[in-house]
Design a protein with these regions (language model features):
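The feature marks the mature, well-folded catalytic cores of soluble enzymes
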Residues: 1-162
């Protein structure tokens, strides 16, 4: 397999101009195994949280395009809460952390876009996470970026580049 490095791809600084911000809409998954085990999450007001999520997306959309990944079961509610400037992208998701399950985007010397699809394992604890493990590939395909698959388990957002 060809590596991003061999094709002169690099991860641009976080502040570097980019095409859009990817977010994931909070999906209330009744099959989620461990949220009630986390005391600070056990009393989470899901609907209030969704409205706050929408406020964040709207604020970001004042400066750049926002693409919101939304579980098919949540499309109707997302359309009623999200501002019409937010692009809704329909795909199953288990959680709302695009920072962790999403792609790591790259550029090469010709400013061609690439993306790494890491293995996402639900932080080693939460399940199911199989839908979230497909989010990065979806993002890369939707962005028409060159696809790089990694077998490394990694939260893509844990890498910071300045």
């Amino acid at each position: 397999m060809t590596s991003p490095q061999s094709l002169n791809y690099y991860m641009p600084a976080e502040w570097y101009q980019h095409e859009c911000c990817w977010m994931q809409w909070p999906h209330e998954n009744p099959n989620r195994n461990s949220y009630l085990e986390v005391e600070s999450w056990s009393h989470f007001d899901f609907e209030k949280g969704r409205h706050k999520w929408a406020e964040v997306a709207k604020a970001i959309s004042n400066f750049e395009k926002v693409k919101m990944i939304v579980h098919p079961m949540d499309i109707k509610i997302a359309k009623t809460i999200l501002h019409n400037s937010i692009e809704i992208c329909k795909i199953k998701n288990d959680d709302c952390w695009a920072r962790d399950s999403g792609a790591t985007f790259l550029l090469n010397d010709q400013r061609k876009l690439g993306g790494i699809d890491w293995e996402f394992n639900g932080w080693g604890k939460f399940s199911p996470h199989d839908s979230d493990n497909k989010i990065a590939k979806f993002m890369i395909e939707q962005s028409s970026a060159e696809y790089f698959k990694s077998s490394m388990v990694l939260e893509g957002g844990s890498i910071h580049v300045d």
